[in-house]
Amino acid sequence: MTLQQQIIKALGAKPQINAEEEIRRSIDFLKSYLQTYPFIKSLVLGISGGQDSTLAGKLCQMAINELRQETGNESLQFIAVRLPYGVQADEQDCQDAIAFIQPDRVLTVNIKGAVLASEQALREAGIELSDFVRGNEKARERMKAQYSIAGMTSGVVVGTDHAAEAITGFFTKYGDGGTDINPLYRLNKRQGKQLLAALGCPEHLYKKAPTADLEDDRPSLPDEVVLGVTYDNIDDYLEGKNVPEQVARTIENWYLKTEHKRRPPITVFDDFWKK
């Protein structure tokens, strides 16, 4: 088995999908989890205005709507959380995503004050954060807020990780990577677009250039610039297609060096890191 085949198998990626079937699969997955653990009353998700959180948010709300109708349990809710750092440049996209999702509840937590306070405390301890590390601080602050909300609403935190993100480890460890349940896992980027199109999402929300937008020195830096490959390259690779050798090498290097991000904390029983 080639490394490409191993990666595809590990991430559960498929060369083709039926959008309606995958929508139903994700909704039923969320519903089954909530029904298995009836003490869970809410799904909590940060909404950025990008493709992934828009899709995950819509699926969450659809799952909650169906469960309420089927069970009569009106205590169930989906909580969409806006988590800007100061003023977000694409705030209108966030509002458009909220309008599309129609969440039960919307909360806004501006993380800038908390991030600056943490940075100052570290500075006083003799640690000066780089712009890159400050970006990770933002991601972790966002997740901290979501877990606080989930804790106060008997909820779980929903993630947006998918195959095209997991393969490169393009998430912050214990930031956006630290979630309870990931309904998009298995899909690649273009497949996520297919689901949003089938759901009637405004096109500009899934045709915009993806960006983590964590760095102050390089605002709205496209993911593809950081990764050195395009999402079309990554999706082709995940679909088992032939890609240029340099593209395959870049993707595989990302996968291998970020293996630790896709695993629980390393113990004495782990040996993957010795390869």
Curated annotation (Swiss-Prot):
Catalytic activity: deamido-NAD(+) + NH4(+) + ATP = AMP + diphosphate + NAD(+) + H(+)
Gene3D superfamilies registered for this protein in UniProt: HUPs
UniProt GO molecular function: ATP binding; glutaminase activity; metal ion binding; NAD+ synthase (glutamine-hydrolyzing) activity; NAD+ synthase activity
EC id: 6.3.1.5
One GO CC term, this protein: cytoplasm
Top class in the EC scheme: ligase
Pathway: Cofactor biosynthesis; NAD(+) biosynthesis; NAD(+) from deamido-NAD(+) (ammonia route): step 1/1
Transmembrane segments: none
GO BP terms: NAD biosynthetic process
Residues involved in deamido-NAD(+) binding: 140, 173, 180, 260-261
A matching Pfam family: NAD_synthase
The entry's keywords: ATP-binding, Ligase, Magnesium, Metal-binding, NAD, Nucleotide-binding
Coiled-coil ranges per UniProt: none
InterPro entries tied to this protein: NAD/GMP_synthase (IPR022310), NAD_synthase (IPR003694), NH(3)-dep_NAD(+)_synth (IPR022926), Rossmann-like_a/b/a_fold (IPR014729)
Residues annotated as binding Mg(2+): 52, 165
Ligand binding (ATP): 46-53, 160, 189, 211
Entry similarity comment: Belongs to the NAD synthetase family.
Free-text function comment from the UniProt entry: Catalyzes the ATP-dependent amidation of deamido-NAD to form NAD. Uses ammonia as a nitrogen source.
Subunit structure: Homodimer.
NCBIfam families named among the record's database cross-references: nadE, PRK00768.1
The protein's name in its UniProt record: NH(3)-dependent NAD(+) synthetase
Gene: nadE
